[in-house]
Amino acid sequence: MINRTSIIKQPDKISSFCDVYKLQKKYQDALISGKSNIDFIWLGEHQLCYTIGRGSNMGNLLFSLDEQDVFKIDRGGEVTCHMPGQLVTYLVLDLHNFNKDLNWYLRKIEKIIIKVLSSFNIDSSTKDGFTGVWTGERKIASIGIGCKRWVTIHGFSINVNCKLENFDKIVPCGIQGCQMANMSDYKKNLDIKEVKIIVKKIIQEEFYFNFISE
């Protein structure tokens, strides 16, 4: 496969969900309109918030909407939670240059997550009928994507050392009884910066990217 160029942003500070969403849309619109042919990757952490996908069941929010920041966004999937200690990765990719197949793309993301976890000697797997990655019976990574004219938006999150009790306020991904896990449950004293380095490396390998800064 021919190497692709992608802009990458990796802020150290905790980022507002709204600000990063606007950034994704800017790059998605540029790819769709033909103003740019450069993909965009963002790796970082968000302030505590909840997001719900298209057609989500509002009954999976177990709190009043005025209690927390909730964003209804243009991705598939149900409700999930973002917070410090969770590494979020957004990929704005033109699938014309890879494979115009969303099932292929979702399986590719799962493969990336499993390889990341394996790099830290954490065994993980997928589950038939579900999207995401599990360690045993607990979910450690969630995936939610949007796609317009074969240009993707949103991506995946891996729980590194976040406050898992924040998931108690929702039915995670619409899965009743779903229990969540952190990477730090299996590898103590884990720094999210270490995970960020590996995620970047594996994305680069899997998509044949040449990364540049804007």
From Swiss-Prot:
Family matches, as Pfam families: LplA-B_cat (PF21948)
Catalytic activity: octanoyl-[ACP] + L-lysyl-[protein] = N(6)-octanoyl-L-lysyl-[protein] + holo-[ACP] + H(+)
Gene Ontology molecular function: lipoyl(octanoyl) transferase activity
Gene3D superfamilies: Bira Bifunctional Protein, Domain 2
Site (Lowers pKa of active site Cys): K139
Location of this chain's protein in the cell: Cytoplasm
Any Gene Ontology CC annotation: cytoplasm
Residues that, per the record, bind substrate: R75, G76, G77, E78, V79, T80, C81, H82, S142, I143, G144, G155, F156, S157
Pathway: Protein modification; protein lipoylation via endogenous pathway; protein N(6)-(lipoyl)lysine from octanoyl-[acyl-carrier-protein]: step 1/2
InterPro entries: aa-tRNA-synth_II/BPL/LPL, BPL_LPL_catalytic, Octanoyltransferase, Octanoyltransferase_CS
Source taxon at top rank: Bacteria
Annotated ranges, domain BPL/LPL catalytic: 35-211
EC number(s) on file: 2.3.1.181
Keyword list, A-Z: Acyltransferase, Cytoplasm, Transferase
Family matches, as SUPFAM superfamilies: Class II aaRS and biotin synthetases
GO biological process: protein modification process
Claim: Transport is one of the keywords in the record: no
Active site (UniProt): C173 (acyl-thioester intermediate)
Entry's family note: Belongs to the LipB family.
HAMAP family: LipB
Note: In the reaction, the free carboxyl group of octanoic acid is attached via an amide linkage to the epsilon-amino group of a specific lysine residue of lipoyl domains of lipoate-dependent enzymes.
Role noted for this protein: Catalyzes the transfer of endogenously produced octanoic acid from octanoyl-acyl-carrier-protein onto the lipoyl domains of lipoate-dependent enzymes. Lipoyl-ACP can also act as a substrate although octanoyl-ACP is likely to be the physiological substrate.
Identification of the protein by name: Octanoyltransferase
Gene: lipB
